[in-house]
Amino acid sequence: MSELHYLYGKPTGTADLRTVNSDFIVKEILPFSPSGEGEHHLVHIRKDGLNTVQVAEMLAKFAKVHPKEVTYAGQKDKNAITEQWFGIRIPGKETPAWIELNSDRLTVLSSSRHSKKLRIGALLGNRFILTLRNVTNVEDIISRIEKVSQIGVPNYFGEQRFGHDGKNLVLGRQMLAGKKVKDRNKRSMYLSAVRSHLFNTVVSYRLTHYGTRPLAGDCVMLAGSKSFFVTPEWDLVVLKRLIEKDIQLSAPLWGRGKMLPQGEAAEVETQAMADLTEDCYGLEHAGLEQERRPLLLEPQGLKHEQTSDGLVLEFILPAGCFATSLLRELVDYQDVKELQWQTTLTAETNVVTESNTAAANVSDNGESAS
């Protein structure tokens, strides 16, 4: 992520993120209210130090159903406190006593029956409450908050999408080159990493060379939807819609089909992807269709408060957008939980290396003596 373009220049303020799980709070916002009847149970859960899959498995075991009967709208971080909805299909059975699941790491906030399955992406957005500790140059951060509130930030896919040390991108490229991956969820995750990297590359290239100005032939999206249309030329009517944020500039989620923008915008995207032709080819032949994603991310209700713990940020992002992509424009932060993971991994690797070296020395000594 460090090589991607900063819209306001690299921040001069620094801070620690996720010193403890409560420094990173996420609350899902559903686009509907549970109907109160039906064979699907919607359970609203607060989890601390658990990932989404772990909770889904706990729910399946408790309800005595197959894990495939448990669904969720999106995955949430493990190293955080998150409030998330789960759907469990339990036809013809009484409502389980969900509250019995409560523990020091999991709390059932509410539950209700619903008539429809909870599907991936069925979210209006997420509310974030982040606490930054050991903050320096807070004046620069606050100045950036004001700019971000007006213009937004690059809508990059965050580091989480690519896995630790970018391994999902590496494995995705290996898969596109022919390596077999049996697990369906892993295949999807690896494909998504390659596609997301391509999107980030195009966004960074465009912002580096052209800023946020519109280009002839742009493919623009209707705000709040996935619908889009091409603008061969920017007349005053269309430009007014962009200024009023009724439409948004976009970048490609690559797949098969002809390039959607035209003219100058198409040329810019082609230039940006010039070194990624193998990624493009692989995604086209993986069965993905071309889609678009907004170029910029505009947070709602972005506010800050200085407390005894540090600087607290609160904002709402649309589903599928990353808080860390917003944060990187505000402050040069270090993720404490990620650093702890890296330290543990390095220590474990050193132990294995030392063990292997010792075993090799014993083997060498044995061969010399024989």
From Swiss-Prot:
What keywords does the record list, in alphabetical order?
Isomerase, tRNA processing
Q: Which residues form a coiled coil?
A: none
Q: What is its EC number?
A: 5.4.99.27
Q: Answer whether the UniProt record assigns the keyword rRNA processing to this protein.
A: no
Q: Point out the signal peptide segment.
A: none
Quote the function comment for this protein: Responsible for synthesis of pseudouridine from uracil-13 in transfer RNAs.
Q: Which family does it belong to?
A: Belongs to the pseudouridine synthase TruD family.
Stated name of the protein: tRNA pseudouridine synthase D
**Gene name, Swiss-Prot/TrEMBL:** truD
